[in-house]
Design a protein with these regions (language model features):
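A conserved ligand/cofactor-binding region detector
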Residues: 1-441
C-alpha cells in the first residue's frame, strides 16, 4: 500500500443551464410535465420558475412522486451526472461498468503504470492478504523493469489496485448501481465509491434522486452483469455442458445463432455504402458466445456497451483456479514465480470466499466466462475494433474466434467481420500496420 493516494469522487458536471435558470432537476421535472401539457418543456419551465420558491419545489416533488415514483423511468433518464473519480480500485471500476447505459473513460494499465498502489481494507491489515498484494506489486515492478510490457505485467496485479475513471450516467442507472451495492458479496470499497456518487447527486438533485421504492424496482432496469454475485447457476451449467472430461472450454464457444433473410448484395450495400436502414436490419442477426477470458480482458469487454453480457461470478471462477499467463511472461525467468503467486493468491481468496473483502486480492489473470450476445451490426462494428492489431492481444484473440464462428454460420455477415480499417477503407490508428490495405471483394 502506498500512502498519499486517497480516493476522490468528484461530481464535475451535471445537466443544467444556469443562464436560463435550469437546475439539475428541471430537465426531468419540466419534461415530465410536458407529457401532460400542450406547452413545450421550455415554456413550462418559464412559468415554473416564476412561482414562489416553496411552491416551485413542492411541484417538483409532486411530479416526481407521480411519474418516476410510479415507475416512469424515462423521467429519470432526462438527467446526466459526470464524475471524475481518482484512486478507486479496479474492483470498483468493474462494478461501475456493468450497467450498459452508463459510459466510461478509464485509465488503461496497458499504458499507465500502477504507481498508486493498492487499497487495503481494515480487516486485512497485517494478514497474509496484505503480504500477497505486496508480493503482487513487487513482481509487477520487477517484470516491468525487465522489459515485460505493462499490458502483460499487470495480469498479476490485484483487483484492489488503484486507478482513475471518468463516468457519465443518468439518475436511473445511478439508482441501478446503488441498488446493486445493497446485495451480498459487494466489497465495502465498492459500496463506498457508489454511495459517494449517489450522495453528490442528491446534493444537486435531492427530489430526483429520492428513493421512492418503485424507482428502485430491479425489473425496471436493463439487467447488468453481476460479477460479484454469490452465484450464477445458468453460466455454471453452460460451462459444464461444454466441458470435456471435466475441463472447462479453453476457447470461445458459439452457443446459438439466428438470422433473417438478407441477401449478400443487400448486406454489402449496408456496410460498404453505409445504408443505415439496412444496417438497422442487421441488428436482427443474433450470435451468442461463451467466452473465457482473464479479468484484465473482461475490463475491456464489459465496457463494450453494444454487447449484451452476463458474466460468471468471481466466486465461481475461484473454484476452478484457472488463470492466464501472458505470452511475454512464458519462457522468462519470471514464469514460475508468476504461476506460483497466482496459485497462492487465488487459493487464498477461494478458501475465504465468504469474506467479501478478500475478493480484492484476486489477480487480473483469473479466468472468468463471459456470456456475450452480439447482433449482425456488432459483427461488423465491435468485432472490427477488437480484431484490429492495436487491440489488446487477449481480447483480440476472443474477437477473432467469434469472427471465425460468424464466418462459418453466417458468411454473408462474416465477410465483414474483419479489422475496422478494411471496412473504413483506411486505418484509423496512428501507426498503421498494413493489415487494413486488404480489400473486400
Amino acid at each position: 500500500m502506498i500512502e498519499g493516494f486517497e480516493k476522490k469522487v468528484e461530481l464535475v458536471a451535471w445537466l443544467q443551464n444556469p443562464e436560463k435558470s435550469w437546475d439539475a432537476e428541471d430537465s426531468a421535472s419540466c419534461g415530465a410535465r410536458g407529457c401532460f401539457d400542450e406547452k413545450s418543456s421550455a415554456d413550462i419551465h418559464e412559468k415554473e420558475i416564476e412561482r414562489l420558491k416553496e411552491e416551485y419545489e413542492l411541484r417538483k416533488e409532486n411530479i416526481f412522486r407521480e411519474t418516476s415514483g410510479r415507475g416512469h423511468g424515462a423521467v429519470l433518464d432526462q438527467s446526466a451526472f459526470a464524475y471524475s473519480i481518482d484512486n478507486l480500485t479496479r474492483a470498483s471500476t468493474l462494478f461501475l461498468c456493468a450497467p450498459q447505459y452508463a459510459s466510461h473513460l478509464q485509465q488503461s494499465l496497458r499504458r499507465a503504470t500502477a504507481e498508486r498502489g493498492f487499497y487495503l481494507p481494515k480487516n486485512l491489515e497485517g494478514t497474509c492478504a496484505e503480504d500477497l498484494m505486496h508480493e503482487q506489486f513487487e513482481l509487477y515492478n520487477r517484470m516491468q523493469s525487465s522489459q515485460i510490457p505493462s499490458e502483460d505485467a499487470r495480469f498479476i496485479l490485484p483487483l484492489y489496485t488503484k486507478t482513475a475513471i471518468q463516468t457519465k450516467l443518468d439518475a436511473r442507472e445511478l439508482m441501478h448501481l446503488h441498488s446493486m451495492t445493497m446485495r451480498e458479496g459487494v466489497a465495502s470499497e465498492i459500496k463506498d465509491t457508489v454511495e459517494q456518487m449517489v450522495e453528490l447527486a442528491r446534493e444537486v438533485a435531492p427530489k430526483l434522486m429520492k428513493n421512492r421504492e418503485t424507482n428502485y424496482e430491479v425489473l425496471a432496469w436493463m439487467p447488468a452483469s453481476q460479477l460479484f454475485a454469490s452465484e450464477n447457476k445458468t453460466i455454471e451449467e453452460l460451462i459444464n455442458i461444454h466441458s470435456t472430461n471435466w475441463n472447462a472450454p479453453e476457447k470461445v464457444v458459439l452457443l446459438n445463432h439466428a438470422g433473417i433473410h438478407m441477401g449478400s448484395n443487400i448486406i454489402k450495400k449496408a456496410v460498404m455504402q453505409r445504408d443505415e436502414a439496412e444496417l438497422a436490419n442487421m441488428k436482427h442477426y443474433h450470435f451468442s458466445f461463451l467466452a473465457p477470458m482473464s479479468l484484465a480482458s473482461f475490463h475491456q469487454a464489459t465496457r463494450q456497451r453494444t454487447w449484451d453480457q452476463s458474466v460468471e461470478t468471481i466466486r465461481g471462477a475461484l473454484n476452478r483456479e484457472k488463470y492466464v499467463t501472458p505470452p511475454n511472461i512464458k519462457g522468462t525467468e519470471f514464469e514460475q514465480e508468476y504461476k506460483e503467486l497466482n496459485k497462492r493468491s487465488i487459493g487464498y481468496a477461494r478458501d475465504r470466499v465468504g469474506d467479501k473483502e478478500v475478493i480484492g486480492i484476486v489477480p487480473h489473470s483469473l479466468i472468468v466466462y463471459d456470456l456475450i450476445h452480439i447482433n449482425g451490426w456488432n459483427a461488423v462494428h465491435s468485432i472490427g475494433k477488437r480484431t484490429c492489431t492495436e487491440a489488446q492481444w487477449e481480447i483480440r484473440s476472443v474477437a477473432r474466434q467469434m469472427a471465425d464462428y460468424i464466418k462459418k454460420v453466417a458468411p454473408e455477415i462474416g465477410k465483414y467481420s474483419v479489422p475496422q480499417g478494411i471496412i473504413f477503407g483506411k486505418c484509423p490508428e496512428k501507426k498503421p500496420c498494413g493489415a487494413c490495405d486488404k480489400k473486400i471483394e
